[in-house]
Amino acid sequence: MGYRRSYAITFVALVAALWSVTKAQPSSSCVSTLTTLSPCLSYITGNSTTPSQPCCSRLDSVIKSSPQCICSAVNSPIPNIGLNINRTQALQLPNACNIQTPPLTQCNAATGPTAQPPAPSPTEKTPDVTLTPTSLPGARSGVGGGSKTVPSVGTGSSSRNVDPLPLHFLMFAVLVVCTSSFL
């Protein structure tokens, strides 16, 4: 009787783990759609400073036909596929191609971008907003060529630095737990 209970608990844990792993990954239709962006690899891996024309045209068609796939790619962790993908450069790809995209804040992992609120009518009074650049303490101001953000390799911890647990490792761990009850 105890063995049945442990198998049932293990089975429920396995189903829950598999469900959470598959829920976090893009759908297969989005994976095939995103693979059409292969001409963009040289840009998002840092091997090119500007995206190619085929990259920009394919990105434009993906954004027009399947914007939910772009949201899915942004919301999912970058899998370890042997490529050194620069997430910052990947997120700057639409700007580099001069392509308008919905703001990332409108991405919803389940449904893709949501509709934008209607623009205020010309008769409505909207407050004037002045945008001014801000600077960090100790930053120099004045004439210069701008600044570049360079990612640093620190010793601090961050949840973004942790790779997701691979499915095959999870399956191996479940197998070990299941077979350990026979020992």
Swiss-Prot record:
Write the signal peptide boundaries. 1-24
Query: One Gene Ontology cellular component annotation?
Result: side of membrane
Q: Which InterPro entries match?
A: Bifun_inhib/LTP/seed_sf (IPR036312), Bifunc_inhib/LTP/seed_store (IPR016140), LTSS (IPR043325), Plant_nsLTP (IPR000528)
Q: Can you tell me which residues are glycosylated?
A: N47, N86
Cross-referenced Pfam families, in alphabetical order? LTP_2
Q: Could you tell me one molecular function GO term of this UniProt entry?
A: lipid transporter activity
Residue ranges annotated as propeptide in the record: 159-183
Location of the protein in the cell: Cell membrane
Cysteine pairs forming cystine bridges in this chain are C30-C71, C40-C55, C56-C97, C69-C107
Q: Which UniProt keywords apply?
A: Cell membrane, Disulfide bond, Glycoprotein, GPI-anchor, Lipoprotein, Membrane, Signal
Q: What membrane topology term does the record carry?
A: Lipid-anchor; GPI-anchor
Task: Tell me the tissue specificity.
Answer: Expressed in seedlings, preferentially in the endodermis of hypocotyls and roots. Also observed in siliques.
Q: Where is this region: Disordered?
A: 108-158
Question: Which GO BP terms sit in this record?
Answer: fatty acid transport; seed coat development; seed germination
Q: Where is the lipid attached (GPI-anchor amidated serine)?
A: S158
| Compositionally biased intervals (Polar residues) | 149-158
So what family is this one in? Belongs to the plant LTP family.
Q: What does this protein do?
A: Probable lipid transfer protein.
Q: What is this protein called?
A: Non-specific lipid transfer protein GPI-anchored 15
Where does this protein come from, organism-wise? Answer: Arabidopsis thaliana (Mouse-ear cress)
Q: Lineage of this protein's species?
A: Eukaryota, Viridiplantae, Streptophyta, Embryophyta, Tracheophyta
